[in-house]
Swiss-Prot record:
Any Pfam family the entry gives: Ribosomal_TL5_C
Subunit text: Part of the 50S ribosomal subunit; part of the 5S rRNA/L5/L18/L25 subcomplex. Contacts the 5S rRNA. Binds to the 5S rRNA independently of L5 and L18.
GO annotations of cellular component type: cytosolic large ribosomal subunit
Coiled-coil stretches noted in the UniProt entry, renumbered to this chain: none
Source organism phylogeny: Bacteria, Pseudomonadati, Pseudomonadota, Alphaproteobacteria, Rickettsiales
Molecular function, one GO term: 5S rRNA binding
Family matches, as InterPro entries: Rbsml_bL25/Gln-tRNA_synth_N (IPR020056), Ribosomal_bL25/Gln-tRNA_synth (IPR011035), Ribosomal_bL25_b-dom (IPR020057), Ribosomal_bL25_C (IPR037121), Ribosomal_bL25_long (IPR001021), Ribosomal_L25_dom (IPR029751), Ribosomal_uL5_bac-type (IPR020930)
Species of origin: Orientia tsutsugamushi (strain Boryong) (Rickettsia tsutsugamushi)
Record keywords: Ribonucleoprotein, Ribosomal protein, RNA-binding, rRNA-binding
Protein encoded by which gene: rplY
Entry protein name: Large ribosomal subunit protein bL25
GO biological process per UniProt: translation
PANTHER family named among the record's database cross-references: RIBOSOMAL PROTEIN L25/GLN-TRNA SYNTHETASE, ANTI-CODON-BINDING DOMAIN-CONTAINING PROTEIN, RIBOSOMAL PROTEIN L25_GLN-TRNA SYNTHETASE, ANTI-CODON-BINDING DOMAIN-CONTAINING PROTEIN
Protein's job: This is one of the proteins that binds to the 5S RNA in the ribosome where it forms part of the central protuberance.
Domain of life: Bacteria
Record family assignment: Belongs to the bacterial ribosomal protein bL25 family. CTC subfamily.
Length: 207
């Protein structure tokens, strides 16, 4: 499990676009804590403080202790909205987590390792990542930083499916009916075709 991060916030009673804009002018980020069966809790935090946490590795899979006035909440980041130009954090949603031992759905990053030893990449292939995160059900006290995927023995043209991932004890994939592809090693010609398709689309958009 990741080391728990800490963050200080405040309850807020004014909602809506104008209120959110006023908070942002003060350097604060409006946010909401969600949990099934409870009324959403509206909070705000200092943008510079939550932005520091956002830049840390494995932010999405790290439990945060959020101190709001005289209350403490254990939360997981759910969604972050950034300004499209300034990348200022406009809004953040949290999920309230239960005590240790309870199960929690969490989005965990996939770390593709062994690229320097990959047979396919050594032969001129290119790692095409389809999924960078996987949805898991994990005990709150055993949420992994990431799920490692070794691609050392993956050859050109081979696909890596979700079933290949080795999950920590107690963690399970959120139910899925398909064994979907999370990455593949494509050859030079396939890579070139993708780049040419992208260039053609860019040219069409500019007309």
């Amino acid at each position: 499990m990741n080391e728990m991060l800490t963050l200080v916030g405040q309850l807020r009673s004014d909602f809506g676009t104008s209120s959110a804009r006023a908070l942002r002018r003060q350097g604060k980020v409006p946010g909401v804590i969600y949990k099934k069966g409870i009324t959403p809790i509206h909070v705000c935090t200092l943008e510079k403080e939550v932005a520091k946490l956002y830049r840390k590795p494995f932010f999405s899979s790290t439990v945060i202790q959020l101190q709001v006035d005289d209350q403490r909440f254990k939360v997981l980041p759910k969604a972050v909205q950034l300004h499209p130009v300034t990348e200022f954090m406009n809004h953040i949603d949290f999920i309230l987590v239960e005590q240790n031992g309870s199960m929690q759905k969490v989005k965990v990053p996939i770390s593709f390792e062994g690229k320097e030893k990959s047979l396919g990449i050594k032969r001129g292939g290119y790692l095409n990542i389809v999924k960078r995160y996987v949805d898991l059900l994990c005990p709150v006290d055993k949420i992994p930083q990431c799920i490692k995927c070794d691609i050392a023995n993956v050859s050109v043209g081979a696909s890596i499916k979700i079933s290949r991932l080795e999950l920590p004890e107690g963690c399970n994939l959120v139910k899925s009916t398909t064994d979907y592809v999370i990455a593949s090693v494509i050859g030079k010609s396939s890579k070139q075709d993708k780049e040419e398709e992208g260039t053609a689309e860019d040219g069409a958009d500019s007309k």
